[in-house]
């Protein structure tokens, strides 16, 4: 029996056919009672707790930093959860991540509702029992207190938190003058004359490490 066949047999039936990958030497750790859809991708240093549901098309990828899902977390269709070396992800118990929502390098508390299309960016913290409604954005390093509602399409910025409607672009920028997106997320100086050349080459080099990922499951069973 090959090592690949052995690894497949070691996986419980309810996620043995999912797309699971070892990345940078780390493998997903999935509770026996969690259910991962066959077309979901789980890659790298990811821990998924009891009773979690990860639906079709969802991607949970630990790219240098860990991802931890508590118990009874639901990740809906085509949602994205991504950690980086600089920003881990933690999602608390009984939280729902809606269809097409994304969490990048952020901490989300327990019993949080992230509606369809919601975005939570690097370094942000969303407190327990909060709601980030349809297409709303929690910006980098924002701190959303417990029980906060971020309205549909609005933008949450800063610590202490400020909430802005999307038409107030100048105020949103003014509320976060020290946030350096290229530097914080990609390690590239914003003022460099070839910013996008450096950004795409550096980030592409990091992403290229997925070429060495080891498949742990077969979507065909």
Specify the residue positions occupied by each region the protein language model found.
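Short, conserved structural micro-motifs that define repeat-unit consensus positions
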Residues: 71-73, 92-95
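Glycine-rich hexapeptide-repeat left-handed beta-helix
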Residues: 3-25, 29, 63, 77-78, ...
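A positional/architectural concept
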Residues: 30, 34-70, 74-83
């Amino acid at each position: 029996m090959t090592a690949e066949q052995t690894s497949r047999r070691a996986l419980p039936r309810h996620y043995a056919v999912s797309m699971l990958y070892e990345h940078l030497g780390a493998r997903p750790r999935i509770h026996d009672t969690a259910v991962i859809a066959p077309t979901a991708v789980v890659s790298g240093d990811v821990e998924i707790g009891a009773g979690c549901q990860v639906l079709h098309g969802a991607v949970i990828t630990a790219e240098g930093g860990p991802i931890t899902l508590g118990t009874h977390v639901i990740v809906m269709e085509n949602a994205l959860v991504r950690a980086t070396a600089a920003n881990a992800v933690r999602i608390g118990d009984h939280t729902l991540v809606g269809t097409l929502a994304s969490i990048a390098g952020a901490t989300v508390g327990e019993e949080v509702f992230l509606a369809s299309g919601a975005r939570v960016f690097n370094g942000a913290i969303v407190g327990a029992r909060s709601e980030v409604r349809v297409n709303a954005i929690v910006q980098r390093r924002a701190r959303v207190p417990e029980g906060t509602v971020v309205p549909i399409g609005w933008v949450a910025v800063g610590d202490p938190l400020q909430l802005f409607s999307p038409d107030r672009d100048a105020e949103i920028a003014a509320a976060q003058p020290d946030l350096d997106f290229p530097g914080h997320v990609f390690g590239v100086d914003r003022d460099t004359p070839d910013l996008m050349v450096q950004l795409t080459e550096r980030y592409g080099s990091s992403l290229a490490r997925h070429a060495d990922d080891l498949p742990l499951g077969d979507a065909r069973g």
